[in-house]
Structure formats: C-alpha cells, structure tokens
C-alpha cells in the first residue's frame, strides 16, 4: 500500500494597507507555513509626498506649516526640530520663558502621542475598552492646545527664536488641573492592563530585541530603551531647558513588546512630572527673541529698490541660512527625529534631509516576525509605533 505524499505549499498573504487611524498605509507581504511566518516584506511609499524636495523650495518660515504633516500625532516635535536647526545654524538665543513654554508643549504632545499609540495597540491584541478611554484624556490635551495655539492638531506654534504667542490667562491653572487628573488616569490604565493575564500572554516574550542588536539596527526612543540602553536625547544633548527639571530616563531590560509598553506608560508619568515643574517655575519675560534682525549686506540701498530688504524685529521671510551644514535632533515620542540641514547663503536650504524615527525602527520588523505566529505580527508592529506620514515623508 502506498502512502499518499502530502504536499506542503507556502501561502502568501497581503496585510494592509490599513486605515491611517490604525497602522496606516503600510503593506506587508507575508509568507506563511500554516500559522508560522516564514518571511515578511514591508512595502512603503503609499504616503510619499516629497517633503524633503518641498523644503528645498521654501524658506524655513514658509515650510513650518508643512512639517506638522510628517508625524501628525506629535506635531510639536516636527515644529521643534524645524526651528531648532536654523537657530543652531544662526546662533539665535531663545528666551527662558519661550524655552519653558516649548518644553510644556513638547511633553503634552508626547503624552498625546503615547495615548494614541496605546489605544490601537490594545485594540490589536483584543482589548477594546482602552481604545475609548484614551480619547477621553487626549481630548483634554487637545483642549489645552486649542486654548494656547488656536489649533487642535496642526498647531504651527513654534517660531525661530521662540513661540508664536504667550500662554493665555488661566491656561497654567487649567494645565495643572489636567496633570493631577491624568496621574489617576495612568493608574487606571495600569490597573486595567499591566497585570491582565490575557494581555501578558499576548506580549510577554514576543518580539525580543537585545541591546547590542538594537544599537546595530539604529533603533531609538522606547524601542532602544526597552532593550536596556539608557539613551534619551533630552539628557544626552541638553537641549531646551530639560536639565533644570528633576526626571529620570525610563527603561526596561527585557526587550520584548511588554517592555516597550512599560517604557511608554512610565514615560507619560515622567512627562507629567516635567510639565508640573515647568508650570510652577515658568519665568517672566518675552516669549520670542525680538532682536533677530536681518540686515542687508549692501550699504545705502534705497527702500524701493529691488535688493532692499525689510529689516524686521521678528525673523523675516528673507531669513538667510549661512553657508554651513548641521545635524539637529530631538527626542520625539517614537525616537530620534533629526534634520540634516545644509545652508547655501540663501533663503532656501540647499539640502534638507529628514531622519524619521519610525522609518528606521520599522527596518527590524521582518527579522522580528520570522518564526513567530501570524497573530503576533500585529502585536510586534503595534509595539514599534509607526506613523506612515513620517515613514514615507
């Protein structure tokens, strides 16, 4: 009697593109052997809008409204890096009050970004309730943003040498009330999620990245700190006024999806600590450097001649970038957000290279999902925290 030979065929499955509110327009071509993942190929570029090329045909001030469309859930950070680079290039000082306002806005934006990571991540692994809870707190942050900047999401609030407007009357008290309320919210999330046996079953030991491996892949942010590397640009680069506050770098050593969750939850608590200290110690003074004057190199120009330039107290539309190159970076919620800027003695940058954290963190995905189960792909992808706006640019 002959035994029938069983044929073992691999199956190729397309995952995505998804709706931007979940994982964005990322397509994964997954090769499966039953439930086991054999290979995974990410397909990018569905949200490419040529952000770097647009930057090379705009002045810095014209380009500010565009940058909020990279990572549209943490827009304060994209604005911060866009003004930090020319500030460093031109050695422009930022008033202390403006620096405090920037830190408050950046940390509120970090919390909002982590909240909108937490909800869809929990929904992916089967917990629907936190998805609705996070919008409650996030809405309060957006109310604060709207009161200070006039916009809920695309704020356009940062300026070269400071911020666009001072904090309105009563805003500081409203923000302090939010901080007290939000600490109880974080405690509620931890009670609901952190010790939940079904949640732990889905994330513990899934998508492990070692410390050396994380460095070799160029990972940054919570992805790096969850692998035991205590690297936070707020401590390393000493930018803005973070050194004046008492806070700790949050890290875990396990390197799995649970560790990445714990790092982000702890970071929200640390952000609240920074915001509270900044609100209580915010100094007086100007909110913008009003002495950034751009004088024309040519002497004795007549006001209506072609090469006459308006001398303003604020950074004028003809703000020139000196002929040098610079790499500036900030610690965004997803990792190191950087810009390599080359000036050419003109109003437009000669080169404007964006280093998005999501794009570089996403590189390790095919390696993490190999030999895992199909259901683990969503857990691992969710724990990386990507926004396709900044991945595709």
Curated annotation (Swiss-Prot):
Entry's Gene Ontology BP terms: photosynthesis, light reaction
Annotated membrane topology: Peripheral membrane protein
Primary localisation category: plastid
Enzyme class name: translocase
Record EC number: 7.1.1.-
Keyword terms: Chloroplast, Membrane, NAD, NADP, Plastid, Plastoquinone, Quinone, Thylakoid, Translocase, Transport
GO molecular function: NAD binding; oxidoreductase activity, acting on NAD(P)H, quinone or similar compound as acceptor; quinone binding
Compartmental location: Plastid, Chloroplast thylakoid membrane
Matches recorded under InterPro entries: NADH_Q_OxRdtase_suD, NADH_UbQ_OxRdtase_49kDa_CS, NDH1_su_D/H, NiFe-Hase_large
Record keyword Translocase present: yes
The reaction(s) this protein catalyses: a plastoquinone + NADH + (n+1) H(+)(in) = a plastoquinol + NAD(+) + n H(+)(out); a plastoquinone + NADPH + (n+1) H(+)(in) = a plastoquinol + NADP(+) + n H(+)(out)
An example Gene Ontology CC term for this record: chloroplast thylakoid membrane
Record carries keyword Cytoplasm: no
Membership in a protein family: Belongs to the complex I 49 kDa subunit family.
Quaternary state and interactors: NDH is composed of at least 16 different subunits, 5 of which are encoded in the nucleus.
Entry function: NDH shuttles electrons from NAD(P)H:plastoquinone, via FMN and iron-sulfur (Fe-S) centers, to quinones in the photosynthetic chain and possibly in a chloroplast respiratory chain. The immediate electron acceptor for the enzyme in this species is believed to be plastoquinone. Couples the redox reaction to proton translocation, and thus conserves the redox energy in a proton gradient.
Name of this chain's protein: NAD(P)H-quinone oxidoreductase subunit H, chloroplastic
Chain's gene name: ndhH
């Amino acid at each position: 009697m002959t035994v029938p030979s069983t044929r073992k065929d691999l199956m190729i499955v397309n995952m995505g593109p998804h709706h931007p509110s979940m994982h964005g327009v990322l397509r994964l071509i997954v090769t499966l052997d039953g439930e086991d993942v054999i290979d995974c190929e990410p397909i990018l570029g569905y949200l490419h809008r040529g952000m770097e090329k647009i930057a090379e045909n705009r002045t810095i001030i014209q380009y500010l409204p565009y940058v909020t469309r990279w990572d549209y859930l943490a827009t304060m950070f994209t604005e911060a890096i866009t003004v930090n680079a020319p500030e460093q290039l031109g050695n422009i000082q930022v008033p202390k009050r403006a620096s405090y306002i920037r830190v408050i806005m950046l940390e509120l934006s970090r919390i909002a970004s982590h909240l909108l990571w937490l909800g869809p991540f929990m929904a992916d692994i089967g917990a629907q309730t936190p998805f609705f809870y996070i919008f409650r707190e996030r809405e309060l942050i957006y109310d604060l943003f709207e009161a200070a900047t006039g916009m809920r999401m695309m704020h356009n609030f940062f300026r070269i040498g400071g911020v666009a407007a001072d904090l309105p009357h009563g805003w500081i008290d409203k923000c302090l009330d939010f901080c007290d309320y939000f600490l109880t919210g974080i405690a509620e999330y931890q009670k609901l999620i952190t010790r939940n046996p079904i949640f732990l079953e889905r994330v513990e030991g899934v998508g492990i990245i070692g410390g050396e491996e994380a460095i070799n892949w160029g990972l940054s942010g919570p992805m790096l700190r969850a692998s035991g590397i205590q690297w936070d640009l707020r401590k390393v680069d000493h930018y803005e006024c973070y050194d004046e506050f008492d806070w700790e770098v949050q890290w875990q050593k396990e390197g799995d999806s649970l560790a990445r969750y714990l790092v982000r939850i702890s970071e929200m608590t640390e952000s609240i600590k920074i915001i509270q200290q900044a609100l209580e110690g915010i100094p007086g003074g100007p909110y913008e450097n009003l002495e950034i004057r751009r004088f024309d190199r040519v002497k004795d120009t007549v006001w209506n001649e072609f090469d006459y330039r308006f001398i303003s107290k604020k950074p004028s539309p003809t703000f020139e970038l000196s002929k040098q190159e610079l790499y500036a970076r900030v610690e965004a919620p997803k990792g190191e957000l950087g810009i390599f800027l080359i000036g050419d003695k003109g109003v437009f940058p000669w080169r404007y290279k964006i280093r998005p954290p999501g794009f570089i963190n996403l590189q390790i995905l095919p390696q993490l999902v190999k030999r895992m189960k199909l259901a683990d792909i969503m857990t691992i992808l969710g724990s990386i925290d990507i926004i396709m706006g900044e991945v595709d640019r």
